[in-house]
Amino acid sequence: MMKVGLQVLSRTMKSHLEGVPDSLGNMRNQLGMTFFRAYASPEAEYNQGGWHIRFQMPITFTPYYYNDKLMGAKENASKTQVAPQLSVSYFLTARLQATLSGGIAQREVDEQNFYQGLLMRDYRNLYMGFVDYTADKSKHVSFNINYKRPLATIFANAYIRKSWSDSHLTVARDFVGDYIINSYFSNSSSSENLMAGGKVSKGLGFMHGLVSVGFDYLRFDGFLRQNDSPSAYSSDNYMLSAKWSGRPVDWFNFTYELNWDKDKMVLKNLGFDSSSTNLAQNLTFNFQPLKSWFIKLHGEHYRNQIADHQHKNLTLADASTSYGFRNGMELSLTALNLFNQRTYGYTVYSGLTRTSKEYQLRGRTILMSIFFHF
């Protein structure tokens, strides 16, 4: 079997950054990029005796046409890329399946970075692109195992994936006054990525419900240059999730969800490390005392790190009820933010950037509605 196709993209960008010092760099962009990507993906499969083997060989050919009107630069280039992939699955038993897969690839040219003027994405971070058609290389291998026992409503899976990337560009960050200039420079570097995790779920027949627990881990090791100082860096992310739902009686059901995550970032040569821990919980009760009467109670709890060794707890609660009359009229009453919380804060990671934010919340709100159904 073979898949073939053609993808066409044409884009233009015009920007003018104001309000920052001209000494930081070029403030304007006016450019265009067009490419035509032809691809073919031959495939072969084998299914017999519990084995499922699949081989793919995607091939792409892409001519690029780049025009930077401000710089007076026109560049044409073409790339041919091949990305073989192999997946082997085997049913160890009727309920247990294992899959081993791997592949080698050349990443597509990131034409989104083809610009040379500065762009601002938030109040502090400036970004400078880099025009280069060299393709980065990567390879990966993964192992998955799945267990299913439908009659007992037991399901489980686990996975581990390792990937390696070789890049011809290295990320650079320079702190200039109140700003951070993010850019690239031509320098070969490598990075590694490890992902592992699993999930187990079990049906609860006696209460018509389900309970599940999952865990995921992500580690990244890479290289960057910060203020002209090269540094290896790593990031770790741990995520734990749990869910419990049920309907013990016909007129009542509930759902509880918990999500916990911890992020850690280390710049090894610069002696810098930082971490953040966050917790979120949700609990919902639904009641139906009568056929036409519904009651819903919902609560949320957040424990978010807003600075080192500082956390902020936030509890929110909503309640609503509705009643439908025989003549088609429905009366609804909703109370939002019962505890009248006013602020919400948290810390997020994006690549090598850590940002703490705080928002103002709408206070307690009472809503009454009348609906007519015809």
PLM region spans:
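Exposed, low-structure sequence patches enriched in small/polar residues
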Residues: M1-F374
